[in-house]
């Protein structure tokens, strides 16, 4: 996370920091609630936010509830997005963090918006979380095929 945060800061991208699931990490609250409030304010102001759907300590590629809760509270849809490049290095970290390198082919692909009703039940939240996870994993497979074509 620090590598991305430092890179984005140098590119003058506004960052909102906060841990998504402190109980899973065995730690106390690490700014997740404040980050959620900040993102809701930004969305209600007509702007967009982005973040990864999986949460430390993993496993990677499994969506947490963060995006679903944000969509429920903000009234904004989730747009699943996957991006990759043909020239990349994959780390052996829990999330298989990937550093995209120059001089390769790149692609970005997005899926259908996912709407979460403000009165969504726990069961509906879990269904939307599964929908997001499946969509992101399918998009990742598709975008990798795009850059691997000769």
Question: Model-predicted segments: where are they?
Answer:
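Short, structured patches in soluble enzyme cores that scaffold and shape functional sites
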Residues: 19, 53-55, 112
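Catalytic core of membrane glycerolipid acyltransferases/transacylases, capturing the structured
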Residues: 1-29, 74
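Hydrophobic, well-ordered secondary-structure segments
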Residues: 8, 19, 32-43, 66, ...
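Membrane-interfacial terminal anchoring regions of lipid-handling membrane enzymes
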Residues: 42-44, 126-150
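Catalytic-site beta-strand/loop segments enriched in glycine and acidic/polar residues
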Residues: 35-70, 74
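A cross-family acyltransferase "interaction/gating" segment
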Residues: 59-122
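Active-site and donor-binding regions of nucleotide-sugar-utilizing enzymes
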Residues: 22-24, 30-36, 86
């Amino acid at each position: 996370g620090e590598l991305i945060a430092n890179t984005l800061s140098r590119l003058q991208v506004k960052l909102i920091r906060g841990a998504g699931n402190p109980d899973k990490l065995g730690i106390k609250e690490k700014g997740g609630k404040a980050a959620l409030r900040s993102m809701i304010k930004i969305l209600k102001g007509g702007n967009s936010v982005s973040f990864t759907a999986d949460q430390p300590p993993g496993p990677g590629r499994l969506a947490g509830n963060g995006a679903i809760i944000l969509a429920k509270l903000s009234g904004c849809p989730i747009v699943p997005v996957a991006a990759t490049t043909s020239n990349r290095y994959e780390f052996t970290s829990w999330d298989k963090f990937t550093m995209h390198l120059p001089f390769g082919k790149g692609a970005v692909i997005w899926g259908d918006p996912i709407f979460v009703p403000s009165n969504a039940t726990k069961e509906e939240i879990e269904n939307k979380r599964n929908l997001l996870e499946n969509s992101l994993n399918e998009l990742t497979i598709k975008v990798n095929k795009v850059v691997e074509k000769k």
